[in-house]
């Protein structure tokens, strides 16, 4: 499929809870195509992350990654990866506020408060589990796309 349309603010799919990717999808062409479509669409829109519900797919998966990005000129590079069935926990109580954008709300940014540090657990394309602690720009990007649906903006 390649590039997909990004749903815009107000679309009901952006307020629907995403379902976990079933075990029998791991390693399948269907999952690989969904991941490829998410990355292609994110790249075409100069995004840092994109969640499946944003392209009208009801699954708990998001992709992140960027090198130099004109939308985030001061951000450190973020490695490309697909995070499937992610679970997040805050590390400590420290919150930070930052200006964030969303591909589903083009042209607008808002100040959003997020956990400064998070512990993230997810599965990769093949179903293997991974864990990582994230902070600074990497934590809010992951948190934003993990917590869809959100009613703050969409």
Summary of predicted features, one role per range:
Residues 150-154:
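Single conserved hydrophobic/aromatic residue that forms the stacking wall/gate
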